[in-house]
Structure formats: C-alpha cells, structure tokens
Design a protein with these regions (language model features):
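Helix-start/capping segments and mature chain N-termini
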Residues: 1-183
Length: 183
C-alpha cells in the first residue's frame, strides 16, 4: 500500500478527490478514531518535550482492538529501554512513550502549526504500517511531516520490526512458533 492520504469525509468522496482513506472522527470533539478500517497513530512531541506515540483508547469502544495495533503497542513498550532497537537506516531515534487516549483533529492541527507533529501512520493486518502524508479537514489541508521520503522514521522502524518477526528474521515474546514439516 502506498503512503496514505486521509480525509475526514465519506469514503467515496475521499477516493474521488484522490485520497486513499477516510480518517473517521467521532463526536462533537471530532476525536480521531480509525483510517478506513485501520488503526490510526500519530507521533508528536508534547509541549513539555516528551515524544509520544498516540492512538485512540479502547475504553469508549469507538475503535476495534486490531491485532496489528496491539502488536505495535507491545513492541514499542517492550523496546522502549533498548537503545539499539531505535535505529533505522543509520538514524538513532528517540524511544516513544505509548499513549492510548482520545485525541482530536484539532490537536493534530495544533501540533502541526506548532511544529510538534513528527509523523502519522495507520496499522492493519494486510499492510502492517502505512504512513499518512496528508489529511484534509473542512477544506483545510494538513501536511504530515515525513523525514524518510514517503514514510516517517518511526513508521519505517515499526514496520521493519513487524516484518522481521513475521518473516522469521527475529522473534518476540512467543509470537511465533516454528512448525516442523512431517513427511
């Protein structure tokens, strides 16, 4: 899947306007929930300087608990204190703190305006991680930063972690089991 362009509208309208997915917003607060049928994540710097991986929480039941979402959260939490895990293409990255909570499109726009948004991506079983590069909300365009071409460093790193586990290049906490062939 190519980098995702998300828009807060109907799916058919989004496709007609050149977007790949809809960023679903919930309630009057317009909380970001999912991108299509995928879980949505943002990486942003807090006003205090911390670096967070933020995704909608499960308590309001506005999103599905996707297995890839859970995998992303587990991997980031497990590798938080392992500095060697946070390198992609020779770039050392600052570890992320996972935050599961409601967050609004207005917060996303604020972090962009203040230069605190690092990147955004969607997670799903079919494609693991797809970077989000653009959101249109109420006819205003929100450009999502990407430091690594079409992807952000964190999206590329997490996608690499998942790929390595799926294809047997590394293991993680009992996620995989080798099944021996019998003749």
């Amino acid at each position: 899947m190519s980098p995702t362009r998300a828009r807060s509208t109907t799916h058919a309208d989004a496709i007609a306007q050149g977007f790949d997915q809809v960023l679903w917003l919930f309630g009057n607060q317009q909380y970001a929930t999912e991108a299509g049928a995928s879980n949505f994540f943002v990486v942003w710097r807090t006003k205090e300087g911390g670096l967070e991986l933020v995704t909608a929480g499960l308590e309001n039941k506005t999103i599905l608990e996707g297995i890839t979402r859970r995998s992303v959260i587990e991997l980031v939490n497990a590798r938080k204190d392992d500095a060697q895990s946070w390198t992609v293409d020779g770039t050392n990255l600052e570890p992320l703190t996972v935050v599961e909570r409601d967050f609004s499109i207005d917060e996303i726009r604020e972090t962009v305006a203040e230069g605190r948004l690092v990147e955004a991506f969607a997670s799903g079983t079919a494609y693991f991680i797809a970077p989000v590069r653009h959101i249109r909300h109420r006819e205003a365009d929100v450009a999502i930063p990407r430091e690594k071409g079409d992807s952000g460093h964190y999206a590329a790193l997490i996608k690499g972690w998942l790929s390595d586990i799926v294809y047997g290049r590394s293991s993680f906490s009992g996620w995989t089991k080798v099944v021996k062939e019998t003749s």
